[in-house]
Amino acid sequence: FSWIGPKRLIPPAVPMAELPKVDVILVSHNHYDHLDIQSMKKIQARNSSLKVFVPKGDMRLLKKRGIRNVFEFGWWDSKQLDSVDFIFTPAQHWSGRGVFDRNKSWWGGWLIKTKLKSIFHAGDTGYSQDFLKIRSKFGPIDVAFLPIGAFEPRWFVSGQHIDPAEALKIAADLEVTKAYGMHWGTFILTDEAVLEARKQLIKLQTPAINPTRPIFTP
């Protein structure tokens, strides 16, 4: 990140130089821990045909910073590339990168569908009925990436960030085959310890409590 925004505790799992060809970047919302323009510039410099899919209201920000091939999406909007459907889905969160732009752009998750498989990334979200709607519209999800961290204190962040228990509820709502916990262990954003989300998720998924154990963490 630049001088604004949180600092990483660990480096990216895959160094920039080792990334394969990138066709599309999907942006869930414009918070600094989800939209890093310098990283996007580096990826675009290595991938001339790169397309960038963003929520409504974020195109101006990216174009102003030199990002090309930007497409805006509202909830349920979709675009097909090479027989792959990209659908922008609702979430319960907010947006803003400064003092005066709060909720000036949209936020959400992304569903990627091929003829054989579906992959869902929830973005940042509190718990809502949106996930039942996603399941109703598109069927059970094969693979989901669900946020589990940045959940304390609940009185303050419950409307915008789910906790590990709610992640399990969303996995059930979506009828996922396999899910992976994300949005933990990379930045210090809220009050819980860095590894607390993973610890709670493991505890909630002991065989005695939850035999199916649908969410995995590295």
For each predicted feature, which ranges?
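Histidine-centered active-site/metal-ligand motif
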Residues: 29-34, 93-95, 121, 161, ...
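Conserved N-terminal glycine/acidic-rich loop preference
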Residues: 21-22, 30-36, 61-76, 122
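Metallo-beta-lactamase
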Residues: 54-117, 200-218
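Conserved phosphate-coordination/catalytic loops
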Residues: 6-9, 13, 34, 101-104, ...
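Pre-active-site segment of Zn-dependent metallo-hydrolases
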Residues: 1-30, 40-45, 96-100, 128-139
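Conserved beta-strand hairpin/beta-sheet module of binuclear metal-dependent hydrolase folds
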Residues: 1-12, 103-123
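Cap/insert and terminal regions of metallo-dependent hydrolase folds
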Residues: 24, 39, 51-53, 57-60, ...
